[in-house]
Amino acid sequence: SITKREVLSQVKYNLKVESMRRKNIGIKQMSKLDKVFYWSDFTEALYRDQIITQSQIDRWSNPYEFRNY
């Protein structure tokens, strides 16, 4: 089973690569909202590939989501 820490590490790496790609081709960087959606899409893909469970998706908060409590 894969942990949230491992998934977050991979997502951070992917976002760094994407940031460098965008800088090199001269397009705007991802917004904070883009990163929220990226996390959701990435974890959904892991679930579809049966790498993580629905329970993990339900328990894991999105580290890129803003919360004003």
Predicted stretch roles:
Residues S1-Y69:
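Acidic, Ser/Pro/Thr-rich low-complexity regulatory regions
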